[in-house]
Amino acid sequence: MIQMQTILDVADNSGAKKLFCIKVLGGSKRKYAGVGDIVVCSVREALPNSKVKKGDVVKAVIVRTAKELGRPDGSYIRFDNNSGVVINNAKEPVGTRIFGPVARELRAKKFMKIISLAPEVL
């Protein structure tokens, strides 16, 4: 469960290390984002000579949340951290690699490029 002012780790090699959530996209009164949702973020920490710089405003898709996520079969899944992948306006990842597992719910939200780059889909 991601809301405004949440700090996110970055799960790709775009060069950003920490993201600060500015807005949850999907309606003016929407408060929370879960796995597969898009948020607008500011880059809080970045590596030098990277594709994104500190202070850039970027869009990111949530790939892991610490809040447990219910599945239709009754099972739950949760991760150790809140992580996102920086995306462009075409909803494709800016980086070329994804680090760590991602949730299966991204497949239903049509983020196939992230699914194919991820080392593990849970």
Swiss-Prot record:
Part of the 50S ribosomal subunit. Forms a cluster with proteins L3 and L19. In the 70S ribosome, L14 and L19 interact and together make contacts with the 16S rRNA in bridges B5 and B8. It comes from the Bacteria. The gene is rplN. Binds to 23S rRNA. Forms part of two intersubunit bridges in the 70S ribosome. This is Large ribosomal subunit protein uL14. The keyword Ribonucleoprotein applies. Belongs to the universal ribosomal protein uL14 family. CDD domains: Ribosomal_uL14. InterPro entries: Ribosomal_uL14, Ribosomal_uL14_bac-type, Ribosomal_uL14_CS, Ribosomal_uL14_sf. GO terms for cellular component: cytosolic large ribosomal subunit.
